[in-house]
Amino acid sequence: EQWLFDGFIFLESQDVDRPDSGAYSYMTGVLRDAGVSAGKEQWQELIDYYFTKGNCADALEQAVKEATARLGKAPCKRRVIIMIPDPIIHRHYIDTTTTTTYWGELGGRRLDFNSNEDRVAACRWYIDQVRARFAQGDYKYIDLAGFYWIREIAAQPHDTEYSYHLTRSDIMLPHIADYLHKLDYTFSWIPYYGSRGYDVWQQFGFDQVYLQPNYYWKPQNDMDEV
C-alpha cells in the first residue's frame, strides 16, 4: 500500500431523497420539470450533512486515520474542497415569473437574487458557515483547502443561446473569488467540454480548472477528440 490521492471534493447538484418529499436544486439547469431552487434552509442542511458525524468530513478523517496506522504519516494533510451552491436567481430557475426573494434572510433583511450583491452575500455566508464548522471539527488528518463552483458553465452576455439571463455568473464569480483569496482558499472549477467560459476562466478568478473530456456522456466520440 502507498498514499495516492491527496485531495477530495464534496459536492451535490440536487437534494431529492428527502422525508418531506421535497426536491431542491443546488445549481441552475437541474430539476427542470420538478423541484425548486435550494434556499438558505437547504444550504444549511447541506452543510450539516457534510459535517454530521460519520459523514463526509468525519468519514474522511477516520479513513485517513486508519490509513495512517497502516502506512505511517502522510506527506501532508489530505485536502478537502467543498462546493458552493449556485445562488439561482429564480425560485424555479427556468421560470422568470417566479420569485427572486425565495432564499431567505441575512442580517434581518430578505435577500433578492435579482441583485448580484445579494447573491454574493449568500455565497459569503455559506463560505463562512463551512469555515466555522470545519474549524469546530478540529481535524488532525484533513485540511480545508478551498471551494468549488458547482455550475459547469459560465456564460457571458453574448452567449444568448445559453440563457445568460438565468445565471449572470460572470458578474458574480470575481467577487466570490476575491473573498476566497483574502481568506487564502483556492477556487476550483470543472467545466464540461465545449462549455462557455472555459477559455476565459482566469477572468472569473478561478485558480484551478479541469476540463471534462465528456467521454462518459458520448462514448461514441473518437478518442482523438477526447
PLM segments and residue spans:
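Glycan-processing catalytic domains of CAZymes
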Residues: E1-V226
